[in-house]
Structures are given as structure tokens and as C-alpha cells.
Amino acid sequence: MSGLSNKRAAGDGGSGPPEKKMNREEKTTTTLIEPIRLGGISSTEEMDSKVLQFKNKKLAERLEQRQACEDELRERIEKLEKRQATDDATLLIVNRYWAQLDETVEALLQCYENQRELSSGTEVPGCQEGLTRDVIPRPDPGTSDLREPLPVQFRAPLSEPALAFVVALGASSCEEVELQLQGRMEFSKAAVSRVVEASDRLQRQVEELCQRVYSRGDSEAPGEVARVRTRELGRENRRLQDLATQLQEKHHRISLEYSELQDKVTSTETKVLEMETTVEDLQWDIEKLRKREQKLNKHLAEALEQLNSGYYVSGSSTGFQGGQITLSMQKFEMLNAELEENQELANSRMAELEKLQAELQGAVRTNERLKVALRSLPEEVVRETGEYRMLQAQFSLLYNESLQVKTQLDEARGLLLASKNSHLRHIEHMESDELGLQKKLRTEVIQLEDTLAQVRKEYEMLRIEFEQNLAANEQAGPINREMRHLISSLQNHNHQLKGDAQRYKRKLREVQAEIGKLRAQASGSSHCIPTLSHPDDPGLNALAPGKEDSGPGPGGTPDCKKEMALLAGATSATSSIKKEELVSSEDDAQALTPVTQGLPSRGREPEARPKRELREREGPSLGPPPAASTLSRADREKAKVEEAKRKESELLKGLRAELKKAQESQKEMKLLLDMYKSAPKEQRDKVQLMAAERKAKAEVDELRSRIRELEERDRRESKKIADEDALRRIRQAEEQIEHLQRKLGATKQEEEALLSEMDVTGQAFEDMQEQNGRLLQQLREKDDANFKLMSERIKANQIHKLLREEKDELGEQVLGLKSQVDAQLLTVQKLEEKERALQGSLGGVEKELTLRSQALELNKRKAVEAAQLAEDLKVQLEHVQTRLREIQPCLAESRAAREKESFNLKRAQEDISRLRRKLEKQRKVEVYADADEILQEEIKEYKARLTCPCCNTRKKDAVLTKCFHVFCFECVRGRYEARQRKCPKCNAAFGAHDFHRVYIS
């Protein structure tokens, strides 16, 4: 029954795995759609940590899935083990039935061979000729020829039911049977087919014999007695054949029932042996109780004897200070009554035990009878048993489950195909998305590479131009330095010229002072000479004293020329200074612009001063005509005073006119300066040079005209002067004029040298100016180019930064796409693994389905055989059930008797313990008369319990955690150190960590 229940449980649980697989497939479909959200990422480390967290999460999920799969596999293994156990049991049953079938078939074949041998000697020759084609030569049943199928030419034609049975046996070919059972299957099929053929052949032989007998009887017309005899013999033969088949069927059924009952008998024998052991244990306990009862009886007898003899027990020397204890008659009678009751109880218990033993022996005898009866069970009883019905129900359940498994397998195949197609579509979609993303990424990377190459080219061009500009600046640096040195040398030269001009001014002042002295001397000597000067000519009046001092008129022209040359040199120097300052202002970032603006006014001041000095010198040099020598000195002095006043007024007028001219020239210079500032550099230089040239030419022409006029006046005046004193002065003046002319020649040479040098320097300055202009233009162009390059470089840097940021963003996108691709690859791998697992499980399910289909067909055949056997076993089963019904009350009675016996035993033990306690109390009462003594005795007992049982001196303070027995710590430690590591009471082994102290308060 347990095997059947296990089978049913396995069958019920067999429908579980497909549902779990369905659930697992649903889980896989849900995990496919689950998105991967990493959140905001600021660095690669954070992304790596989040990816690791996601991987750990996925690994945990995979571990959970694996654990769930392992649990499912464990459950499946347990179910398969249970199923294997049930299959083994069924296989054992099938093997047993099959072996019995082979034995019966061999027995039948042996009987048939024996009958053939017996009938071969007694047959009629005519019958032998007729039977030669029907009888097949048969080997021994034990030989290996039985295991080979018979050839077709030796087989006789069979009847329709026999042929159908043989065909059914042949249909159960080796396709459903394993290779190791194939030989046995062939042997069984051959043997059964031969048995069927033999039975059919015998039947046909009998029918042929009957027909021959009838035909011969009709033809030969024998006696009626022979016919009746043959008919009776045929009927008897048929009856005997039917009886033989029935007996064989009964023998087969009985053998099967015998094997089953033999198994049950073995189990009951084991149970009986167990019960016998329990009975022996109970008998041993009863003997123990008897011995204890005898001891108690002895003690009671001694107590009675002491009581009857009037013996008094005095206190012992153990420290109890009690008086004598005497037992009253009432207590003694009570004890006697209790003793008698206990004896009666023991006797009754003994009788009960004997009765139980007798019942046990009767149960054993009935069990043996039942064993014998179980060997012949009717078939109806077997059919009505619960096991047979359970087998039928289980067969129907298995058949229905096989149909359900087929439908579930078809559904699983459909789901697998659908999931496979959806998986393939999903993979194609993912591959197309991946290809599109890769194409986009490639195009973006190519664009970025192109832009990066362009930026690199522009950067290289800018770098080359920057290096060229640096080289050009390095080349222009020494030229600029040379120009600065030249400008500084020209400035130094201008300073030297200014110093010379100051020196000449100082000399001019000295000369004017000498002229003043000469005028004073001349005024003293020529006060009588009448003035013949023209009032309208201020220049002659101004030059008259000079003539008196310096002699003839032409003597004053070299000094004037020298001064004019000095003035021209000063003006050219100022113009060159202006040009140099303009160039230096352009080179030095307009650092000297105030100097260039202030120089024209400084240049005009020295121009105005020499003019005033010349006029001052010319004024006194214009003295009276030579005809004035005849005048008296008083008249001269008067005329001189008047003339001085007139000269002063004329000088004031001249100074005012010069002031006006200077103001006009100042205005012109201001206009020129404004024009110079507004005009470009080259035009300013040209205008300045042309203005200086015109001014110098005008001054030179003016000075030449003045010199001519002075020479003419000197000639006219030289004719008039006749004084010796005048002659002497004239000589001195001529000498001075010669000296001045020599100086003027020297100064002219110097002026020519300076003019040539100025021309050379002007030419060089113009060349340098042009070169500076070109260099400045180149510098401007280079500055513009540098500015352009710098702006382009800034733009390129910005573009480079933007491209780098875009590259970083694209790199992050690429990393994200790579992570997505990796995740998708992981999901694809997981799906492939799941697909492989599903394919493997599908293959396993298909194999299991094939096995189940084979098992189903086997079960069908077994069911057919079982149906055939069930009819045979029904009668035996009914018989066995009746016997079992008879045995069950006996078993119930025996069980009740055993329970009663155990109950009585327990009750006896309780009574004995109760009596023992009473006896101990009575003993204490007898020994100790006082209650204090009883308490002291109990205290002593408790103290004895608290003392160590090993040494009996120290108290218990250590416990063994293995068995929880208590001893003193010194004894336990001593035993541990002496390697006696076992408990003194129960011999349980203990270690170093298996004992510790206990503190009993």
C-alpha cells in the first residue's frame, strides 16, 4: 500500500515541473524588458562602481535563480527516487510473475513432450502419416532452442484466436523493451507461442481423430458399443483437458498468492520475533519484581518476628540521640494487610501474564494457520481488495496524467517555438539597432577626426607664422637698435650744436660788448662830426657804430654771414631733431612727442636772438658820415645824443616790427605744427624740410641784401672818414674784420662741412625714414597678421575646446553604448543559456515522454495481464479476505490483551514503587523515633548527595557538559590530567572544554 501511495504522490507531483517551467519562462520574459538605470554619473570611477553594483545585483539574482533551480531539482530528484523505488517494486513483481510464467510454460512444454513420446509408440501408422505434417520436432525446454522463434515452414496453420494471440505477442517487439530484456522477451514469446501452437495442434489432432473415427464408423459400420465408447472417451478427454487447464490456472494463482503470502509471513514472523523479545523482556522484569517481592517478604517476616519477640531497637551510634522506637500493633496489622494485598496483586498479575503468554501462543498458532490459508486465496477476494482497486485507480490516473503530459508537452513545444522566434526577432532588432548606432558613431568619429585634423593644420600654420614673426622680429631687432643708436648719436650731435650755438652767442655778446666799448670811444672822438645818416634807413644807423669801430663797411659782412650760417645750421638742426624725434616717437610708442612739439619754439628763440643781436650790432655800427669830421665836438655830442635817441626809437620800432614778424612766424609755425600733426609722417617731414629750406633761403637772401647795403654804406662812409683817429680805428676795425672774415671763412667751411654732413645725414635720415616706414609697415602688417593669427588661434582653441567637450560627450555616449551593448550581450548570453537549458529540459521532457509512453504501453499490457490475472485472483482474494476477517478479531483481541498486559505491568510497577516508599517511611519511623532525627537523617542524605562520589570528601562543584554528571573539580581535573577522560558513572568521554565549575548555594 505504501508503494502505491508513493506512486500516486509521484503521479500527482509529476504535473508540477511543466508549471514551474512555464513560470520560469514567464520570469525570463519579464527580465528581458527590465531597464538598466545607472542614474547621474560624474566620473568613470562612479560609473565603474555603479556597474559593479549592477553586476553584483545581477549575480545575486542569478544565485537566487540557481538556488531555486537547485531546490526544484532536489524536489525532482526526491520524486524520481520515490518513483524509482515504486518502479523497482513493480519491476520486482513483474520479474517474479514473469519467472513463474516461464516456469509454468516450461512445465507445460515438458508435459507436452512427454505426452508426445508416450503417444508416438501407440499411434496407428495411418495416423502417423497424417500427423507428420502437423507435429513439429521440439527440443528440450531447457535448451537454447526455445529462445529462438520457430521457422515458418515448420509452423502449422493456427486457429483465429490463437493466431490473434500470437500476433499480439509478436507486436510487442523489442522496440519497447530494453536490450538486456530482449532475449528473455523472445524466449517468453517463443515459449508461449509454442504452448499455444501445441494446444491448438492437440485440439486439431483430437478433432481429426474424431472425424476419422466417425468416418470409419460410417464406412465400416462398427458396433454401436465402440462408437459410444469413443464418444465417451472424447468427452472425457475434453473434460480432462478443461480440468487440466483449470488446475494449471489454479496452480498459477496459488503460486502467485503463495509468493505474496510468503512475503507477508516473513513480515509477520519478524513482528512475532519482536513480540517474543518484548515478552522475554517482560518476563525478565517480572522475575526482577518477584525477587524484590521475596526480599520484601523476608524483611516483613523479620519485622514480624521482632515485633512478636518484643524486640526494641535502640538508637545507633551515628549521632542520633533518640530513645527507643516501638511499633504499635495497629501499624503492624496495617503492614500485614498491605503485604497480603500486595501478594494477592502480584499473584493476579502473574496469572494475567500467564494468560497473556497462552494467548500469545494461540496467536502464533493461528498465525501459522493463516499462513497456510493465505497460500490458497480465491480470485474474487483479490479483485475485491483495496490494493487491486488502488492499482486500477492508479492506472487510470497514470493514463490521464500521460494524456495531460502530452498536451503540456505540445503546449511547451509551442511556447518554446514562440519564445525562440520572439528571441530571434529581438536579437535581429538589437543587431540592427547596434549596426545603426555603430554607423552613427563611425560618422561622428570621422567628422571629429576631420575637424581635429583641420584644427591641427591651422594650429601648425599659426605656429609656423608665429615662429616666422618671431624670426622677423629678431631680425628687425638689431635694425631698430641701430636706428636708436643713430638717433641717439644725432641727438648728441644736436646737443653739441646747441652748445656751439651757446658758445657763439656768448662770443656774440662779447663782440657786442666790445662794440659798445668802441661806440663809447667813438662817441668821445667823433662828437663833432655831423650825422649824415638817412633817417629812413634804420639799418644804416644801426651799422654806423660798427663802421666807426671796425673800419670799412665790407669788414662786417663775414661776421653777419657767419651768424646767418649759424642760424641756418640751427634751423636745420632743429628740423633734423624734429625728424629724429618723430621717428623715435614712432619707435618708442610716442614717448618723445612733447619734445617734438616744444622744439620749434626753442628753434625760433635762437633765430630771433641772432636777429636782434645783428640789428643791435648794425645799429651802433652805422655812424655819422665822413663829412661830419669838420663839425665840432659839441655839435657831435648833441647830434650823438639826438642820434642815440633816434636810434633808440628806431630800435624800438625795429624790435616792434621784429616782434610782429616773430608773432606772425609763430602763427605760421603753429599752423605748420597743426598741419604737421594732422598730416602723415612722410608729408610732415617733407613739409618741415621745405619750410625750413624756404625760411633759410629767405633769411640768407635777406642777410645778403643787408650785407650789400652795409658794404655800400661802408664804402660811402669810408670816403667820408678822414680822421687819423678814425683811420686808426678803421685799421683796427679792418684788422678785426679780417680776423672776423677769417673766422667767417672757417665758419663757412664748417658750415659747408656741416651742410654736406647735414645733406648726407638728411639723405641717410630719409633712407632710414623710408626703411623705418617700410619696417613699420611690415611691423603693422605683422601685427595685423599676429592679431589675426591670435584671434584665429583663440577661435581655434575655442573650437578645440568645444570639439574636445563634444569628443568627451561622444566618448561618454560611446561608453554608455558599450555598457548597453555589454548588458545586451549579457542578456543575450543569459537568453542563450536559458534557451540551451530549455532545450535540454525539452530533450529531457521528450525522453521522459518517450519513456512514459513506453511505460504506458507496458502498463497497458500489464493492465491487460493484470485484468487476466485479476479474474484468476478474485476467488483466492475472497477466500483470503474471509480468512483475514476471521483473523482480524483474533489480532484485535491479542492487541487488546497486550495493551492490557502492559497496563497491568505499569500498574504493578507503580504499586511496587508506592509500597517501597511506604516501606522506607516505615523503616525511618522504626529507626528514628523523633522527627528531628528524621530530618537530620534526610539532611545527611542530602549532604551525601552533594559530596563527590569519587573521593567522598569534597563537595560537588564541577559538571560534565556531555552527560551532566556532577563531581568535584579536583577529581575531574585529576582524571583529565591522568588521561582517564571518561565519566565515572556513565563512561561518557569528555574533553578539555566539556567540564566547568558549578556553584551550589
UniProtKB/Swiss-Prot annotation:
Residues 55-91, 189-377, 437-525, 627-946 form a coiled coil. GO terms for biological process: chromatin organization; positive regulation of transcription by RNA polymerase II; protein ubiquitination. The modification N6-acetyllysine is found at residues 20, 355, 517. Residues 565-576 have a biased composition (Low complexity). It catalyses: S-ubiquitinyl-[E2 ubiquitin-conjugating enzyme]-L-cysteine + [acceptor protein]-L-lysine = [E2 ubiquitin-conjugating enzyme]-L-cysteine + N(6)-ubiquitinyl-[acceptor protein]-L-lysine. Its EC number is 2.3.2.27. Residues 1-40, 122-142, 519-647 are annotated as: Disordered. Pathway: Protein modification; protein ubiquitination. InterPro entries: E3_ubiquit_lig_Bre1, Znf_C3HC4_RING-type, Znf_RING, Znf_RING/FYVE/PHD, Znf_RING_CS. It comes from the Eukaryota. The modification Phosphoserine is found at residues 42, 584-585. Pfam families: zf-C3HC4 (PF00097). It is an enzyme of class 2 (transferase). GO terms for molecular function: mRNA 3'-UTR binding; protein homodimerization activity; ubiquitin protein ligase binding; ubiquitin-protein transferase activity; zinc ion binding. One of its GO terms (cellular component) is HULC complex. A zinc finger (RING-type) spans 948-987. Residues 18-28, 602-619, 633-647 have a biased composition (Basic and acidic residues). It is found in: Nucleus. Component of the RNF20/40 complex (also known as BRE1 complex) probably composed of 2 copies of RNF20/BRE1A and 2 copies of RNF40/BRE1B. Interacts with UBE2E1/UBCH6. Interacts with RB1 and WAC. Belongs to the BRE1 family. Component of the RNF20/40 E3 ubiquitin-protein ligase complex that mediates monoubiquitination of 'Lys-120' of histone H2B (H2BK120ub1). H2BK120ub1 gives a specific tag for epigenetic transcriptional activation and is also prerequisite for histone H3 'Lys-4' and 'Lys-79' methylation (H3K4me and H3K79me, respectively). It thereby plays a central role in histone code and gene regulation. The RNF20/40 complex forms a H2B ubiquitin ligase complex in cooperation with the E2 enzyme UBE2A or UBE2B; reports about the cooperation with UBE2E1/UBCH are contradictory. This is E3 ubiquitin-protein ligase BRE1B. It comes from Mus musculus.
